[in-house]
Amino acid sequence: MLSIIHVGWLELVWFVALYPFACWTLFAVLKSVYRITLHPLAKFPGPKLAGASYCYEFWYEIVCGIQYTQKIIKLHEQYGPIVRINPDELHFNDIDFVDVVYTAGARKRDKSRHYLAGFEGSIIRFVSSDFHSFLIDTRVKKPERLKRVVLGAERHHDAKDCPMFLELLNSNLPAQEKSKQRLMYEANGATLAGSGSTAIALSNIVYNLVANPRIGHKLRSELMRKVSASKNLPTWSTLEELPYLTAVIHEGLRSMYDPSKERLPYDPSQERLPRVATEEELIYEGGSALGKSKYVIPRGYAISTSAHVVHSDESIFPNASQFDPERWLDRDGQRNKELERHLLSFSKGSRHCLGMHCRRATCLAIPASARNGTSGYQFTSGQLEYKVQERQ
């Protein structure tokens, strides 16, 4: 009798322990089947595993170490200009479609909630474009402060420093909006937005100027020829008129990554920037080496691209793995404005990089400031070894 009761309790324990797991497994399987058969994005090309689960992206991004961007490039070579890269997101690789996805004006584009999952508590997490419009309208309808600024009543402020976090702490925001965690989220967003990308771009530019003496000498000749020998740094407008310097900067921004490396340094240009069209379907008509294609992207689903994918496209940038500033110049040696529209280092549309002008100015200023400082040195590529190390 006791043995029967004992066996019954064991069966009950196993049932209670395994039943939830069995239900979850069945649900996951059915959900995966739905995603690759009846889901609105099921008709788009791409690996079935990527469409069925986020585990596919997790493997390349976490286990392999930030390698999904490189994998996406290979997926485009296999499947064409539009690829399904996870259950709820498409990725495109067509420069002519960029202005449709990353648009400005009345055509609304919201951020993907999946992309914003890592920005909990930050102002970056505000998704809706309607919310931004509301804020702008509210500020415009309050002209009192604008009047005081125009009349000079609020002009006596220190312009050398803008302590954002001190302003937040001293504001009238609710206490929960001024918590330590909230400030940490805001600091994280501000740090990731610009510091690493500028440093990586400048490191790439300086390395290639030293590793390629011909490019370095040509740039120095232009600077010595068109910029005065004064110790003062020329103005930004003067530097932007130098075609070869601008070409070097553009090439440095484009080629921040070496595809031959197994691990790539972090930079926002590697990230996908998903956009969601909330009020319209997006129609894609284009082609690739695999032939012409036409797709209708349903509204409410994310579609993205990344600067690294576009900048590695051999059809736009032949020999993309090489550092070649001449690609940005036309036959007359002037800036190639048509090619410049393919530079996506600062994204495009209504939510492009707010610090793009500061970043460009920094990238122009550093090489120009060294125009008189390298005349006593000669370098060859054999003397250099460029490595990226992660700081703990």
Swiss-Prot record:
Needed cofactors: heme
Glycosylation sites: N319, N372
Binding site for heme: C353
Biochemical pathway: Secondary metabolite biosynthesis
EC number(s) on file: 1.-.-.-
Top-rank lineage group of the source organism: Eukaryota
CC per GO annotation: membrane
Membrane topology: Single-pass membrane protein
Record field: transmembrane: 10-30
PROSITE patterns, per database record: CYTOCHROME_P450
EC top class named in words: oxidoreductase
Keyword Transport part of the UniProt annotation: no
InterPro entries: Cyt_P450, Cyt_P450_CS, Cyt_P450_E_grp-I, Cyt_P450_sf, Cytochrome_P450_monoxygenase
Broad class of the protein's primary localization: membrane
The entry's keywords: Glycoprotein, Heme, Iron, Membrane, Metal-binding, Monooxygenase, Oxidoreductase, Transmembrane, Transmembrane helix
Molecular function GO terms recorded: heme binding; iron ion binding; monooxygenase activity; oxidoreductase activity, acting on paired donors, with incorporation or reduction of molecular oxygen
Family assignment from sequence similarity: Belongs to the cytochrome P450 family.
Task performed by this protein: Cytochrome P450 monooxygenase; part of the gene cluster that mediates the biosynthesis of pyrrolopyrazines, secondary metabolites showing insecticidal activity. The role of ppzE within the pathway has still to be determined. The single multifunctional NRPS ppzA is sufficient to produce peramine via condensation of 1-pyrroline-5-carboxylate and arginine, N-methylation of the alpha-amino group of arginine and reduction of the thioester and the cyclization to form an iminium ion resulting in release from the peptide synthetase.
Protein name: Cytochrome P450 monooxygenase ppzE
